[in-house]
Design a protein with these regions (language model features):
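Beta1/beta-strand and adjacent pyrophosphate-binding region of the FAD-binding site
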Residues: 41-60, 76
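Short, solvent-exposed loop/turn and secondary-structure capping segments
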Residues: 86-90, 100-101, 107, 263-265, ...
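N-terminal glycine-rich dinucleotide-binding loop that anchors FAD/FMN and/or NAD(P) in oxidoreductases
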Residues: 90-139
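Mid-to-C-terminal Rossmann-like scaffold of FAD/NAD(P)H-dependent oxidoreductases
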Residues: 38-50, 419-442
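Active-site- and interface-proximal helix/loop "cap" or "latch" segments in soluble metabolic
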Residues: 1-36
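Glycine-rich loop(s) and the adjacent beta-strand/alpha-helix scaffold that form part
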Residues: 348-354, 358-432
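Glycine-rich FAD pyrophosphate-binding loop
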Residues: 70-90
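Conserved redox-cofactor binding core of oxidoreductases
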Residues: 148, 152-353, 374-375, 429
Length: 442
């Protein structure tokens, strides 16, 4: 029995009660009972062959596994923890994607409602300051980004009014031009209403994939601590992330996920109102949410993203009998062929049983980062000033996020990028590591 973080004294009291019960029962080995040690015996080595191996059963891993299976591949997922969910199940649970039926429609600009899957919803409205942001983007300098602009002007992350004067990286120029055209059409409709005295919060929200792409670009544009280099998101990856994300909600709903289809909120760290809020799952299709542990948020996140995908992978996809999730299995090594191609993995289960899984088509690493290894975060840091990260700095990540996948990939020659730019949330005290609310809700 382990002590649970956040319930330390309760856990100790529970363990003391068990020891007292063991004494009253005249346990034959009370000292052994107190040691709380479980001895595992390794089984025979396990060796399997499948089409696709996925390492990590978090949001990325399970999405990859299900899509691979839906594409006709057999899949084996290996997860170090005792349950699927990864870091996603410990997150706030929302994902960003603009829902066209809830926002301003240039084809029907005066519409106050939209229809999704046969149900009519009220369109959502702007938050205070949204239109100011749109106007700043509309005036963004279209010249090639000039980092020398900040030789005389301090760079402040999030200050887009200043950032907009420095230009734009060439690969994002096309998106910026398209976005400006979208914004201009919107302002041609919205500005007369503002001029007539209508409040910003009464005007239908503007939100498009192009805005999401461009905000991901400037939201991630950063200087390193020494002010000698810059980093920003790869355009192709950001575009894929945003445009592919437009299909995520429907894909999950087809598997039984439930979302609040009436809102597009914003959470801590986000730049726009385009969050999709989770509501659980309806796996039997009876129209009511499945039990979620007395509305425990972590359980609801699990139901939305993992009860659904797990059922698809192991029960409902056409080739479900060919798929498997191996829990409490730590992958320790990537297997490569003579040409350096990764063709499988080696690992070990919780009891010491060795595991080898060969992949006929590919191996996907979905093991997350290393936020739970604060010393490593400090060692790789190239962004935060001295003193902003200390050994006391806490994390909202799970304890298994220690960079094992990165280590294995580097061991077979994989390159990394952006390792020095760790994202920090404004909810931690640097001096003592205490965390405020972890879900990200205001």
């Amino acid at each position: 029995i382990d002590v649970i973080s956040g319930a330390t004294f309760t856990s100790i009291g529970f363990k003391n009660a068990l020891i007292d019960a063991a004494k009253q029962a005249e346990a034959s080995d009370l000292d052994g009972f107190k040691k709380n040690t479980v001895v595992h015996t390794a089984g025979e080595a396990i060796e399997k062959t499948t089409d696709v191996v996925v390492v990590g059963a978090g949001g990325a891993g399970m999405a990859t596994a299900v899509q691979s299976a839906q594409n006709g591949n057999s899949v084996v997922v290996l997860e170090v923890n005792s349950e699927i969910g990864g870091n996603t199940v410990a997150s706030g649970g929302q994902f960003q994607s603009a829902q066209s039926y809830l926002v301003w429609d240039p084809a029907d600009p005066d519409a106050t409602t939209g229809v999704y899957k046969g149900v009519t919803y009220n369109k959502v409205h702007n938050a205070t300051g949204n239109i100011k942001v749109l106007k700043e983007i509309l005036n963004w300098n279209e010249n090639e980004f000039d980092s020398k602009y900040f030789d005389s002007t301090p760079f402040v992350a999030g200050d887009i009014e200043t950032l907009s004067h420095a230009g734009v990286h060439a690969e994002y120029l096309g998106t910026l031009k398209e976005l400006k055209s979208e914004i201009q059409a919107y302002l041609n409709w919205a500005q007369p209403q503002l001029d007539a005295g209508k409040a910003e919060g009464e005007i239908t929200l503007f939100s498009t994939p192009n805005l999401h792409i461009f905000q991901t670009y400037y939201g991630g544009l950063r200087q390193n601590a020494e002010k000698t280099s810059w980093i920003y998101g790869s355009y192709d990856l950001v575009k894929q992330f945003v445009e592919g994300g437009q299909d995520l909600k429907g894909w999950l709903e087809d598997q039984g996920a439930i979302f609040d289809n009436s809102i597009q909120p914003i959470i801590v760290g986000a730049l726009w109102n385009r969050e999709n809020d989770f509501k659980g799952s309806d796996l039997n299709g009876d129209g009511t949410p499945d039990p979620d542990g007395k509305n425990v948020k972590g359980k609801t996140v699990y139901n939305t993203y993992f009860a659904t995908t797990r059922k698809t992978l192991l029960e409902t996809v056409a080739n479900h009998a060919d798929n498997e999730i191996m829990l409490r299995t730590k992958v320790t090594e990537l297997i490569t062929d003579k040409d350096g191609k990764v063709v499988g993995v080696k690992g070990v289960q919780y009891d010491g049983t060795p595991v080898t899984v060969h992949a006929k088509k590919g191996v996907v690493l979905a093991t997350g980062g290393y936020a739970a290894d604060i010393k490593r975060v400090m060692e790789t840091n190239d962004y935060w000033p001295d003193g902003d990260i200390t050994t006391h700095t806490g994390t909202t990540n799970r304890s298994s996020l220690v960079g094992s996948g990165i280590d294995m990939a580097e061991a077979v020659g994989a390159a990394t990028t952006g390792m020095g730019f760790t994202q920090m949330m404004p909810i931690s005290w640097v001096d003592n590591g205490n965390l405020a609310f972890g879900g990200g809700h205001y």
